[in-house]
Amino acid sequence: MSIPKNVLLELAETFEKFNSCNLNDVYINLFSQQLLNLSVTKEHGAIILSPINDDIIYNKSLNIVKEILEIKGLSNIKIINQKKDIIIFFNEIIKTIKEMLEGKIAVFHKNDILLKGFTLTSYMLQLHQQVQLILHGRLTTYKIEGLDIVESNILNFIENNKSKVNKDINGILGKDKAILQYLIALTMSTPEYDTHLHTMNEKDFEYLYLHIYTLVDLISKRELITSKIFEEINMTVTDGEFIFHDKNWANILNEFGETFVDERISTPNEGFPNIINVLKKNFHKALGFNFDNLEKFITFEENLLPKQEKQLCYPFFKDYLITLMTEHTGCKKDEAIKTIDYYTLQPITDKDLYFESIDKFEYRLLEKPLVPIQIKGHILYLVSIPLLLNAINITYHKLIYNLIPECKKDNSKPIQKIIKNDLVLNVADIIKNYTVNYLCNAKDFTIYDNEKQKKFSFTSEMDVIAIVNKTLLIIECKDLQYKYTPFGYRKDIQKALKYINEISSEMLEIKDNINIIQKYFNEEIKAIIPILLFKTHNIVYNSPIDKKGVIITSLHKFENNLKSLMNQ
């Protein structure tokens, strides 16, 4: 492909501006303030990590909100059990910050922000991975090649203060990802001003990061307080600061954070070799390209580039990207195009989405890692190995949990049959240590009544039933697709309420026909306990929702539940 000279000149100019601004130092300072309560400064060639009494980012964010509330006359108000009013209140502040961000973004060259934001997100993913591996004891700082002195100091501090960092790490990393994804999304949908455009510098980036941090934090607070995690949704604003009046606020989030850390360490990675090929085949049929194309494609870096030339961002014109895809995956051109199109980030057209959690965005950089930029009418794609690897993991996760809309129909049955049954069998392995009277996938029963054989079928299949201490346990297993975000908490609670209602309906039929189960096991039943069991820990456990007598637990805690029952 022959590239016009003016395109090459603008491309060179764009990358020259990019290389003249190093955002990594600004970013890692902001990151350190959240994670370690440390400020990173350079003095006389040395790196100084200074403890800070208050979270600098939090205070700056608070000041942004205070200024907005003061202008709008909302600095001192009280909202009591009015969900609608709380949503209106938060959305008014979110709208103002969004408009401030759009006004700021519009004066910059769009390609400049996209290139810098894209590369920084790639850098962020590398840093996050290093932090997680160090915290889990699978990596030490001295084994990481190519660290500069700032990164080395930060990671060393994390390595030596694991207990301090570990509790809050997932919330901080999640917010960090949300901020940079939000920046890219808002930049793509914000038109440039027709007047003279500027290049984003370090100070500009800090402004954008802090304001998006504030916006993401407000969306999170709104989602939390209006979900059903808390008994009351009373809120007071005093001198611009929010006070939530609910005794569960700190208890639930602290307990959840600690348990999540425990289970994250102890729960093995998911692996379903018997089913993954079936799911991938259906993926290919639905979307027109091989699931493994992206993983094969990333070998281009090893095959084409010497180690010293590897970088966080590669720009490719689409024709060349298609050629690389066909060469490294062995697929045909039309399949390469479908792969590229599927993983290409698109602008968000629904502006109301910017009032929602990043989880709800249809197009997110971490899922759609190919970012197109326009130069003189030509499309150039930004490509990053860390982002591609991250997208592969997300796509795999969504495939296993049947969250890819195009694949849902064909993949529902194999997922239900194999993946869910894997959890059922795990539960049965625990139960058999406490009773011989248990049954998996219970629906059809054959009993003998007065020496006559009788068959009975319940309307719904029960995942596991067991009799322990003359108590019938009705266990429903749910391999929940959980997300550790406020929006994720809301979705988890909505799903849990649905499951609780289903179990409550089933209980009526079970109670009416309890004699069938007693005769089947030849054991008296004096009580019935319904149990909703999730594969991992969940925010639902300690929330004040009406559980209708259903015990909610996890696979991790189930054996303790059984031991308690045995001791009654």
List where the protein language model places each region.
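Short, solvent-exposed loop/turn segments at secondary-structure junctions
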Residues: 445-446, 480-481, 537-539
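Nucleic-acid endo/exonuclease domains
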Residues: 421-427, 431, 439-441, 450
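Catalytic cores of nucleic-acid endonucleases
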Residues: 479-535
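Short, well-ordered alpha-helical segments
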Residues: 417, 421, 425, 429, ...
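Active-site metal-binding core of divalent-cation-utilizing nuclease and nuclease-like domains
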Residues: 440-470
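Short phosphate-binding/catalytic loops that engage adenosine nucleotides
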Residues: 436
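Active-site beta-strand-loop-beta-strand hairpin of nuclease catalytic cores
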Residues: 466-485
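Acidic, metal-dependent phosphodiester-chemistry machinery of nucleic-acid enzymes
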Residues: 1-418, 425, 429, 433, ...
